[in-house]
Design a protein with these regions (language model features):
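A structural motif
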Residues: 112-115, 140-149
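Short, glycine/acidic-rich beta->alpha junctions
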Residues: 36, 93, 157, 164-168
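Extracytoplasmic, non-cytosolic globular domains
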Residues: 133-141, 163-192, 197-200
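Flexible glycine/proline-enriched surface loops and loop-helix/loop-strand junctions
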Residues: 119-124, 155-160, 168-171
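Beta-strand initiation motifs
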Residues: 21-27, 74-83, 145-161, 203-204
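Beta-propeller blade signature
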Residues: 68-76, 129-144, 198-201
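Acidic, Gly/Ser/Thr-rich repeat motifs that build Ca2+-stabilized beta-propeller blades
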Residues: 1-125, 174-189, 194-196
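Short, surface-exposed polybasic-and-hydrophobic patches located at secondary-structure transitions
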Residues: 3-7, 13, 151-165
Length: 204
């Protein structure tokens, strides 16, 4: 209800537009991301208990070979207490990195989960079939970054990457959860046309 607008900037800053007769802009946090091509600070979402814990989650490209989802605490419009939530997410340091993140309850309302989407990292040669990689996948974690054991490809000690929720995504730049049903809709960017998919557990 604060009417603030959070903005991510590719080059590193997360900014807040503060409401008022004349809106003002302030810096919430500044990363030092890898910014080649489609890399950078990519998305932001808020904890369902934000009013109490003030948690803000941010997806960004940490290096030419790694993306991360981190959590900051909103301390009067300043991000503090950075915590790594999910690390080691794949990137080739170029394109099709995806970068969307969001939080939803499961469709039975039993808990809250963190989702993210990553494209094929510019590799169109079947990385979606590689179940050890999160490239070309939608991932799902608990809010602390741990793996839910009801993820569809969970196999404990491997070889699958247990975070995988769905696969076969070329460049899933953004997604949304449908209010009420919590259905996941992923927007997949193409070369000459775009596609929108309703994505369910284990889809390909």
């Amino acid at each position: 209800g604060s009417r603030r607008l959070f903005l991510t900037q590719k080059t590193g800053a997360v900014r807040i537009v503060l409401p008022g007769t004349t809106p003002t802009l302030t810096t919430f946090y500044t990363f030092a991301p890898y910014t080649s091509s489609e890399c950078g600070v990519l998305s932001v979402c808020f904890d369902p208990n934000y009013i109490t814990n003030k948690y803000v989650y941010i997806f960004y490209t940490a290096s030419a070979s790694e993306q991360r989802i981190v959590r900051l605490t909103d301390n009067n419009n300043v991000g503090t207490n950075l915590a790594n939530i999910v690390t080691g997410l794949p990137t080739a340091g170029a394109n099709h990195d995806g970068g969307a993140t969001g939080i939803s309850s499961d469709q039975n309302g039993q808990g809250w989960y963190l989702y993210w989407s990553i494209g094929d990292n510019g590799n169109g040669s079947g990385v979606d079939a590689n179940m050890t990689s999160l490239a070309s996948k939608c991932g799902r974690a608990r809010l602390d970054g741990s793996v839910p054991n009801d993820n569809p490809f969970f196999d404990g000690t491997g070889p699958n990457n247990d975070y995988i929720w769905a696969r076969g995504l070329r460049n899933p730049f953004s997604f949304s959860f449908q209010p009420g049903s919590e259905k996941l809709w992923i927007y997949n960017v193409g070369t000459s046309y775009e596609t929108v998919f309703q994505v369910n557990r284990g889809d390909h």
